[in-house]
C-alpha cells in the first residue's frame, strides 16, 4: 500500500480522533502513510514524541513557509476558515513530497475505517481525481447548498490531471474560503461541485460503504453479520464519518444523528459508535501523561458577522441542548465512567 498516501490535519483538541483514524488505517490499509498537518505546537510535540510508524507529522509553520500565499490569508479568516483554506494546499504539499505515490487522498480527521479501502481504489482505475457525494437523505436535501460532495475524502492521482485539479482548488480557496454560503461557494467544499465538468478523469465514488454518516445513514438498512457492519445487506461499511461527536455535560458523549433526523439503531450504537468511542477513550488514556485531550471539542465556527447569524447561532445552541436531553432520555448517548463507555 506504499503507493497510497493519505493526509489530514488536526490540532491537539482533535488528537484522539486523528490517532483513531491513524490506527484504523494501520489495521485496514497497512503500509500506507498518513501525513498530519499539526495545527498547534502541542499536537506536533505529542505526535513527534509518539514516533508512530508511517505517521508523518509536520508543523504548521513549516507548511506556511512553503506556501506563503496560504499563510497570508490567515489574518482575514477565522481559525476554522483558515483550516479549510489549508485543505487543498496541504494535499498539494504532500503530492510534491511523495513523488512515488500513486494516490494522495485527503481525509477528514473524524473518519474511522472498518474495512480495507481497496474496493474504493478498484473504482478509481483510470481516474485521476476522486470525490464522494454526501448522499443526503430527502430530509436533509436543503443541505445541498453546502455542496453536492463531501470534502471528507478527496483523492488525487500523482499525475498532471490530478495535480491540475488540486492546484486549481488551492487557488480558489486562497481567493475565497469562508464558513458561509455565497452563491455556489461554501468553504473548501463548494468548489468540488464543478470538478466533474471542469477536470478530466474525475470519479464520483459510488460505493455506499464509503463515508456513511449521520446525514445519509437514514437511506440504508444497517445490520451486523459475520463480524461485519453491512449496509443494505450486501455492502460492508468501509469507513464512517463521525461528524459532530462530542463530549457534553461532563460524563456523556453525544452524536448528532438527531440534528440530521437520522435513526440510531442498536446495531449502529453497538457496532459502529461503540468501537470508535472505545478507541478514543483508549487513546486518551494512553497519551494522558503526554497531553490531556479528554475534553475534545470541534473547532469554533466563523465569527458572528451580523445579528441574524448571532440569533441563528443562539437558536442552534438551544436546539442542540434540547437534543442532548432527548438523547439522554432515549439511550442515544454514551456515559463515560473511569475511562469506560456505557
Question: What residue ranges belong to the model's regions?
Answer:
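GT-A fold catalytic core of metal-dependent nucleotide-sugar glycosyltransferases
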Residues: 84-136, 155-156
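Conserved catalytic core of nucleotide-sugar-dependent glycosyltransferases
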Residues: 121-175
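N-terminal anchoring/stem segment of glycosyltransferases
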Residues: 1-75, 95-101, 288-342
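A structural signal for short, well-ordered beta-strand segments and their strand-loop junctions
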Residues: 35-36, 105-106, 131, 203-207, ...
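Short, charged, surface-exposed secondary-structure boundary motifs
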Residues: 64-72, 138-144, 215
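Low-complexity, glycine/alanine/valine/leucine- and proline-rich hydrophobic stretches
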Residues: 236-285
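Catalytic core and acceptor-binding pocket of nucleotide-sugar-dependent glycosyltransferases
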Residues: 161-245, 252
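Short, solvent-exposed loop/turn segments at secondary-structure junctions
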Residues: 13, 41-43, 111-112, 135-138, ...
